[in-house]
A protein has these predicted regions:
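A short acidic, often aromatic-flanked loop/helix-cap motif at beta-alpha or helix-coil junctions
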Residues: 1, 84-87, 144-148
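N-terminal catalytic cores of NTP/NDP-binding nucleotidyl/phosphoryl-transfer enzymes
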Residues: 2-61
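Residue-level signal for inorganic ion chemistry
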Residues: 17, 69, 107, 167, ...
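N-terminal Rossmann-like or analogous alpha/beta NTP/dinucleotide-binding catalytic cores
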Residues: 49-111, 115-133
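Glycine-rich, Lys/Arg-enriched anion-binding loops that position phosphate/diphosphate groups
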Residues: 130-230
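Phosphate/ribose-recognition catalytic cores of enzymes acting on nucleotide-derived substrates
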Residues: 184-297
Length: 297
């Protein structure tokens, strides 16, 4: 057992969206009030991935999740998602993990939190176990936006259907994908639009195929950009990829790590008759972005 008592936020927190933030911020606030260690206790992978061999695509990688949690003032503590852990009863989880391992004094979770083997424990049972083992339990109610509950599954649906602006409202920030720029076929360079090619991490959520207004962060600098996600039908390439053209960047980005923030869906991916038609469309897309943003100002 750790000597310092903890204020623990419980959940998987994929996306660290606005509802998640309320849970984490509540745990951090309780930690500050009582001089506790603020902890976000979560799994390293979705339980369904271990139990059934598949899971919904991840909105955030573990690295991104940890960065977002740290920014809220908490420390992310990972539980290795194993069958032995998932087979624990709710009572065993409370006693062995929350109390004996993390010395819980305060526990915060969402209204629909489940724990223990086959999700046998709910918030009512957690509250009872808190009284038995000596920790307080705070249950955060659901967060509603647009008449619906804010949830990771809802955000995944929005992103995968290209409704980026709606997803970003629920996330409380722009949906983003980070990766190292790799060499592609250099087609963009030959037509005057060199692109930074990033191949997202396996299991990561990708937006619907199409063209998006984006912002790229490189070494702390944020630059306006345009990103195409999909299979590049004009040149017959079937591998899923993400190509970003940054008008103001003339430096070589190969090997550099960048973050692409998705701002707005522009149009679906389509096949052009030739490369000249593709060039004309890219210019139209860029002009459309400029006109849209000038109108907003």
């Amino acid at each position: 057992m750790t000597a310092v008592q903890s204020s623990i936020a419980l959940g998987f927190f994929d996306g660290v969206h606005t509802a998640h933030r309320t849970i984490i911020e509540t745990a951090v606030r309780k930690a500050e009030m009582r001089g506790l260690r603020p902890v976000v206790l979560t799994f390293d992978k979705a339980p369904s991935e271990v139990l059934f061999g598949s899971a919904p695509p991840y909105i955030t990688t573990l690295e991104e999740k940890e960065r977002l949690i740290n920014a809220l003032g908490a420390q992310m503590c990972l539980m290795h998602t194993s069958r032995s852990l998932l087979s624990m009863t709710a009572e065993e989880f409370a006693e062995k993990i929350l109390v004996q391992k993390y010395n819980a004094a305060e526990v915060t979770c969402g209204f629909n939190y489940r724990f223990g083997s086959a999700g046998s424990g709910d918030t009512q049972l957690l509250t009872k176990l808190g009284k038995r083992f000596g920790f307080n339990v705070t249950v955060v109610g659901e967060r509603i936006s647009g008449g619906e509950t804010v949830s990771s599954s809802r955000i995944r649906t929005l992103i995968s259907s290209g409704r980026i602006e709606e997803a970003n409202i629920l996330l409380g920030r722009s949906f983003s994908i980070s990766g190292t720029v790799e060499h592609g076929k250099r087609l963009g360079r030959t037509i005057g639009f060199p692109t930074a090619n990033v191949y997202p991490q396996s299991g990561a959520l990708l937006p619907m195929s199409g063209v998006y207004e984006t912002v790229v962060e490189i070494n702390g600098e944020r630059l306006s950009a345009i990103t195409n996600t999909g299979t590049n039908p004009t040149v017959g390439k079937e591998t899923l990829r993400m190509e970003t053209y940054i008008p103001s960047a003339e430096v070589d980005l190969y090997g550099k790590r960048i973050t692409v923030e998705f701002v707005r869906f522009i149009r679906p991916e389509k096949k052009f008759s030739d490369l000249e038609a593709l060039k004309r469309q890219i210019r139209e897309d860029l002009n459309g972005i400029a006109a849209f943003n000038n109108k907003k100002i």
